[in-house]
C-alpha cells in the first residue's frame, strides 16, 4: 500500500530496513527560525482571513441587502469557503507543525484535508459561475440574465458537487505510528505518537484520483474562466472603439471594467496561490519532500 504523509514539517524518506514511504524526521526538521516564521505566517493568515472574510459576508448580507446581485452573492460564497478553511484547517496545521505528531483524533485527521479540498472546489466553481454571469452581462446582454435566485441555486449545486468530489480525501486519511517506528533519536519522545497520513490501495488509484482532481478542480475551470474573460476583454475593446458613445454608456463601461478587473485579480490570485498545493496533491508519488 502506498501511504503518504500529510505533515506540515517536511521530512526525508526513511531508508531503514524497508521501503516505507513515510518520512525520516531527523534529517529534515525545519530550524527554529523557519518554524517560527511559518507559525507567524499561519497566524497572520488566520486572523486576516477570519476578519476579512467575515466582514465581507456581513457587508453583503446586512448592509447591502437591497443591492445584492448574482456576483456579490457568489463573492460571499467565496468568503464563506475561505472562512471554513480558517476555522477547520489553519490552527490545526499550526499545532501539527509545532508538535510533529497528530493529537486531534482520527475524525479531525480526515476532516481537515476533506474541508480543504471542499474549499478549493467551492472557490473555483464560484469563480466559474461568476465568469458566466459576467459573460452574459457584457458579451450577450440580450440573452439569459442570471438572477439572485439563480445564484442561490448555483451555490447549492456547487456545495453538493464539492462535497461529493472530495469524499476520497475523507476516506483515505487515517492515523498511524509507522513514521515514528524507525527513528534513531535517543529519546522516547515519539513513542505512542501518531501521524495523519494518506493511504491508498495502490499508486495507480492515487494517480487516477489526483489527476482527475487536478483537471476538475483546477485546470478545466481556470481554462473556462480564462476563455470567458478573454471574450469579455475583446468585447469591451470593441465597444470602446466606437466613436458614438453616450456619457451614461461610458460610465457603465467603466463600471464593468472595474468589476472585471477585480474579478480577474481574484482568479489570478486564486490560481497562483493554489497551484503549489494542487501540484503536490497531483504528484506521481504523492510524498512531500524537503
UniProtKB/Swiss-Prot annotation:
Record Pfam families: 7tm_1
- Note the SUPFAM superfamilies from the entry: Family A G protein-coupled receptor-like
Q: Gene3D superfamilies recorded for this chain?
A: Rhodopsin 7-helix transmembrane proteins
Where exactly are the transmembrane stretches of this chain?
40-60, 84-104, 112-132, 151-171, 207-227, 259-279
Task: Kindly list the GO CC terms recorded for this protein.
Answer: neuron projection; plasma membrane
Q: Where are the annotated glycans?
A: 11
Found, by tissue, as follows: Expressed in heart, skeletal muscle, gastrointestinal tissues, spleen, brain and adrenal glands.
Q: How does it sit in the membrane?
A: Multi-pass membrane protein
Residues on Extracellular side = 1-39, 105-111, 172-206, 280-290
Keyword Transmembrane part of the UniProt annotation: yes
Q: Name one GO molecular function term.
A: neuropeptide receptor activity
Where found, per UniProt? Membrane
Domain of life of the source: Eukaryota
**Keywords from the UniProt entry:** Disulfide bond, G-protein coupled receptor, Glycoprotein, Membrane, Receptor, Transducer, Transmembrane, Transmembrane helix
The function of this protein is: When expressed, is unable to bind pancreatic polypeptide (PP), neuropeptide Y (NPY), or peptide YY (PYY), suggesting that either it is functionally inactive or that it may have acquired a pancreatic polypeptide-independent function.
Query: What's the family?
Result: Belongs to the G-protein coupled receptor 1 family.
Q: What is this protein called?
A: Putative neuropeptide Y receptor type 6
What would be the name of the gene that encodes this protein? NPY6R
Amino acid at each position: 500500500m502506498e501511504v503518504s504523509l500529510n505533515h506540515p514539517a517536511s521530512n526525508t524518506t526513511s531508508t531503514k530496513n524497508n521501503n516505507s514511504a513515510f518520512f525520516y524526521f531527523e534529517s529534515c526538521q525545519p530550524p527554529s527560525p523557519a518554524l517560527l516564521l511559518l507559525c507567524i505566517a499561519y497566524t497572520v493568515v488566520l486572523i486576516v482571513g477570519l476578519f476579512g472574510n467575515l466582514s465581507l459576508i456581513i457587508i453583503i448580507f446586512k448592509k447591502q441587502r437591497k443591492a445584492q446581485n448574482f456576483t456579490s452573492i457568489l463573492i460571499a460564497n467565496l468568503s464563506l469557503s475561505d472562512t471554513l478553511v480558517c476555522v477547520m484547517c489553519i490552527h490545526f496545521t499550526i499545532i501539527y507543525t509545532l508538535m510533529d505528531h497528530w493529537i486531534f483524533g482520527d475524525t479531525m485527521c480526515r476532516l481537515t484535508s476533506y474541508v480543504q479540498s471542499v474549499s478549493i472546489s467551492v472557490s473555483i466553481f464560484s469563480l466559474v459561475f461568476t465568469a458566466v454571469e459576467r459573460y452574459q452581462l457584457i458579451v450577450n446582454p440580450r440573452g439569459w440574465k442570471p438572477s439572485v435566485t439563480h445564484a442561490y441555486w448555483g451555490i447549492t449545486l456547487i456545495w453538493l458537487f464539492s462535497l461529493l468530489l472530495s469524499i476520497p480525501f475523507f476516506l483515505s486519511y487515517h492515523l498511524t505510528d509507522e513514521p515514528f517506528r524507525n527513528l534513531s533519536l535517543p529519546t522516547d519522545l515519539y513513542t505512542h505518537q501518531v501521524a495523519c497520513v494518506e493511504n491508498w490501495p495502490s499508486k495507480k488509484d492515487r494517480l487516477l484520483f489526483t489527476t482527475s482532481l487536478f483537471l476538475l478542480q483546477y485546470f478545466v475551470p481556470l481554462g473556462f474562466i480564462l476563455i470567458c474573460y478573454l471574450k469579455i476583454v475583446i468585447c469591451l475593446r470593441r465597444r470602446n472603439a466606437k466613436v458614438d458613445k453616450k456619457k451614461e454608456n461610458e460610465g457603465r463601461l467603466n463600471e464593468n471594467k472595474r468589476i472585471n478587473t477585480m474579478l480577474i485579480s481574484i482568479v489570478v490570485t486564486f490560481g497562483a496561490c493554489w497551484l503549489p498545493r494542487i501540484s503536490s496533491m497531483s504528484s506521481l508519488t504523492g510524498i512531500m519532500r524537503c
